[in-house]
Amino acid sequence: MEIKKLTNLHGELTVPGDKSISHRAVMFGSLAKGTTKITHFLEGADCLSTISCFRKMGIDIENNSGEILVHGKGLHGLSVPADILDVGNSGTTTRLISGILAGQNFVSELTGDDSIQSRPMKRIMTPLLSMGADIASIKGNNCVPLRIIGHPLKAIHYDSPVASAQVKSCVLLAGMYSDGITSVTEPVLSRNHTEIMLNYFGAQVTSEGTTASIAPEPSLFAREITVPGDISSAAYFIAAGLLVPGSEILLKNVGINPTRDGLLRVCKDMGADITLLNVNMEGEPTADLLVRTSSLHGTTVGGEIIPTLIDEIPMIAVMAAFAEGTTVIKDAKELKVKESDRILVMAENLSRMGADITPTEDGMIIHGGKPLHGAEIDSYLDHRVAMSFAVAGLLCDGPLSIKGGDCVKISYPEFYEDLYRLGE
């Protein structure tokens, strides 16, 4: 995939539906009684893996061009899988569905692609085992493939060593099949889509500080869900609008959940001109984002804000390379166990373009403001890396090519078309 320099990006754009919310809508709709209608569903490869897994467990799911009908069968309505459950590249599918499968009355196996088979699953296996679950890594390396022998579980309180919405969600979902109140405490609050949506479906989930708790055996009932635009997908257009000279972009109906809005706060710290319009704070908060070209400067990103922007750090790193001054990103060791080691991959590729960047154990230091040139970028099949460097390619001197650039289909199949449409 080759990217060329552009100026004057203008127009309106509705980014795809939020990936985290799309996953959960299908999962919880499958466990609810009745038909759940989901509009603006993200039809990326990861979310389609979730649909595939629940279809294999007997759930009828209709897909009508982004409108999904999930004919749920209730909390105990899943059937023995017709085949091994293939999660593809999706960590969310793997970790959340494991919590559900642990409480079923059947045996299941999860597999996935090479990338997911290298990502850490001990972080969910540990709490599930303490609930009495029978879950094992088939290769004995605490990774996928996993074998889960479902049975009733015992309630626990789990102190999670990491702020991870996937770990928290896994434990809460398993807690629905337990014998009492199950709770999870995190060191820092992670995204809370599971808590919001489970309550919407009828579960009893309470949150206090960084602790979330769920009562067992909830009766979940079908709902209608409109998925907001994914702020992680909007991030690339926010960055492009800020960096590309002469630009003004309106991004419609973007999710601005406070557990996900760290990117907006960092952009403001860097001097960004971003205006929130049509703000709606009911349920999952949303707003239209008006983004104008800005002169950015370096900042420090670390501490409690990290879980609210962990997926946006590759894009922030690119922004920092074009901003004046030094940006320090720290407390982000989680980047090392994403689809790629995003610390090393961002440092390697930005260095190829002439950026002054030093990787650290938990982040990176970027001395910005140097002119960057085109290069051959290796995405390592990481969709967020590919999209971040596509934005960089709009600004650098000379063409930039992205090896494995098609991996954007994981979360944003029409990404390149949308990007160039704004430059027409």
Language-model-detected regions and their locations in the chain:
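Structural preference for solvent-exposed beta-strand-turn elements
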Residues: 1-424
